[in-house]
């Protein structure tokens, strides 16, 4: 049974950005975050948590969000930064970068989850925000489509790992490929399965 959450009550603010991340769990590639300010006069139908949408639907909404949003941006932390900072801190930094990169600065930021990075404006964490807040849903779609496409590019370079299929997550196929072929530069050296393969303990 999934727990039902109360409908989200928006804070009194003029320009609200939603922020979400994709890629905290994978063993390879960047953690990608997005920030989106939606236009209330140009609504987008069908926004929800990106994980609940088909790839085809995500791609359609990805283009629609970019076209209709007041502003959208991406922020990221690469594997080297993740290894240096740890994944939670790297995610916070990536979120800060996404917000800072918006062409229009929001006066309030809603962030998926339960942790908030330090930001120059008011912010609020929203549990299950990708389901409850349209701005966060939009950010989750932008971040996921962006990262998935990066994994497809990496897959073309290193087809032996199956990145296009598992998107870098630690599936049995991925871990077996790591054991067989070793790690590539884009693998996160601080993540346990990669550390084990590299003999770093």
From Swiss-Prot:
All copies of domain RNase H type-2, residue ranges: 14-201
EC number: 3.1.26.4
Database matches in PROSITE patterns: RNASE_H_2
Cofactor: Mn(2+); Mg(2+)
Subcellular location: Cytoplasm
Coiled coil segments of this chain: none
Catalytic activity line of the entry: Endonucleolytic cleavage to 5'-phosphomonoester
One GO CC term, this protein: cytoplasm
Broad class of where this protein is predominantly found: cytoplasm
Amino-acid positions noted as binding a divalent metal cation in the UniProt annotation, renumbered to this chain: 20-21, 112
Superkingdom as given in the UniProt entry: Bacteria
Record text on cofactor binding: Manganese or magnesium. Binds 1 divalent metal ion per monomer in the absence of substrate. May bind a second metal ion after substrate binding.
Keyword list, A-Z: Cytoplasm, Endonuclease, Hydrolase, Manganese, Metal-binding, Nuclease
InterPro entries noted in UniProt: RNase_HII, RNase_HII/HIII, RNase_HII/HIII_dom, RNaseH-like_sf, RNaseH_sf
One Pfam family hit: RNase_HII
UniProt keyword Manganese, yes or no: yes
Family: Belongs to the RNase HII family.
PANTHER family reported in the protein's UniProt record: RIBONUCLEASE H2 SUBUNIT A, RIBONUCLEASE HII
HAMAP family xref list: RNase_HII_B
Protein's recorded name: Ribonuclease HII
Species this protein is from: Photobacterium profundum (strain SS9)
């Amino acid at each position: 049974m999934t727990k039902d959450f109360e409908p989200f009550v928006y804070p009194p603010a003029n320009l609200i950005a939603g922020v979400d991340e994709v890629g905290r769990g994978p063993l390879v590639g960047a953690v990608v975050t997005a920030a989106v300010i939606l236009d209330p006069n140009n609504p987008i139908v069908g926004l929800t948590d990106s994980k609940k949408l088909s790839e085809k639907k995500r791609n359609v909404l990805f283009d629609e969000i970019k076209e209709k949003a007041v502003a959208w941006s991406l922020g990221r932390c690469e594997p080297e930064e993740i290894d240096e900072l740890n994944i939670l801190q790297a995610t916070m930094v990536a979120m800060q970068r996404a917000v800072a990169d918006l062409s229009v600065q929001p006066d309030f930021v809603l962030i998926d989850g339960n942790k908030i990075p330090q930001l120059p404006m008011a912010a609020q964490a929203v549990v299950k925000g990708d389901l409850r807040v349209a701005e966060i849903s939009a950010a989750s779609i932008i971040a996921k489509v962006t990262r998935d496409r990066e994994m497809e590019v990496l897959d073309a370079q290193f087809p032996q790992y199956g990145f296009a299929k598992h998107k870098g997550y630690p599936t049995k196929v991925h871990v077996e490929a790591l054991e067989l072929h070793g790690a590539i530069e884009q693998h996160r050296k601080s993540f346990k399965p990669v550390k084990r393969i590299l003999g770093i303990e």
